[in-house]
Amino acid sequence: MRSIWGLIVLVAAATFYLYLLSAFLPPGPRAIRVHDTGPEHTDDEPEEKVLRLKFPSDLEELRELAELLKFYKTEHTGYVFILFCSAYLYKQSFAIPGSSFLNMLSGALFGPLHGLIIACTLTTVGSTNCYLLSRTFGKRHIVRLFPEKVAMLQRMVEENRSSLFFFLLFLRFFPMTPNWFLNVTSPILNIPIPIFFFSILIGLIPYNFICVHTGAVLSEINSLDDIFSWFTLLQLLLIACVALLPGALIRRYSKDHLKLHGLEPNGHQKILNDRKTR
């Protein structure tokens, strides 16, 4: 019971810290002018909309948040960077779904290259925090809640102990792999932190690349003409290639080196199909 209360205290403290960051904003715009595409508005009638900082839940909220933070970033770059990093680590550390929107926001705010570096770094650090929190507070509770799933994953890890790093890469490369579950169960599976750390850093590069570049592309699109520009089409083609390449490579390697009896032919784990969330 003590471990549960310790985790609750940490979550409450982190939540309060995020609240303070968002409540005491530096001087800047509290509203932005957006174009309403409804029938009652024209392109010459921008509507002023008051926005508040919150985690985006759809693409429209993502675009609005990106516009607001871009205004702040022009004069308060450090604040925006600290706010973004804090929000990202909050989600990753406590296994809260929704990292894809923050990856896209990273691309929109910091550009494709810097956004990718930031996203990969924060994903790795946040997932490692999740690993440490699980090891400190949640091991027995996770085993109690998911006994069959943990046992099956434990068997698969032991079968691939000699190629553990590549096995973890296999699980990370496939987009439907539940990363939150791998993060919280890794201490139970006796996966060393160095192997866990680098499997996250390398294994999620394709996923982060796709999200970050998608965010960068979306932030530059203001009309249909922008979508069909050669530059945008080339970026979308690059994203598609990156999405396909890891799966092809890891499948070829897995046939000879990995034991994947607990996985379906498409690479997804049967034992976790009911809880596939990022």
Curated annotation (Swiss-Prot):
Would the keyword Protease turn up in this protein's UniProt record? Answer: no
Report the InterPro entries cross-referenced here: TM41A/B, VTT_dom
Question: What residues form the membrane-spanning segments?
Answer: 78-98, 101-121, 164-184, 191-211, 230-250
Give one Pfam hit by family name: VTT_dom
Bilayer topology annotation: Multi-pass membrane protein
Q: Which family does it belong to?
A: Belongs to the TMEM41 family.
- Tell me where it resides: Membrane
Predominant localisation class: membrane
Taken from the UniProt entry, a GO cellular component term is: membrane
Q: What is this protein called?
A: Transmembrane protein 41A-B
Alphabetically list the UniProt keywords: Membrane, Signal, Transmembrane, Transmembrane helix
Q: Where is the signal peptide?
A: 1-23
Q: Does the keyword Heme apply?
A: no
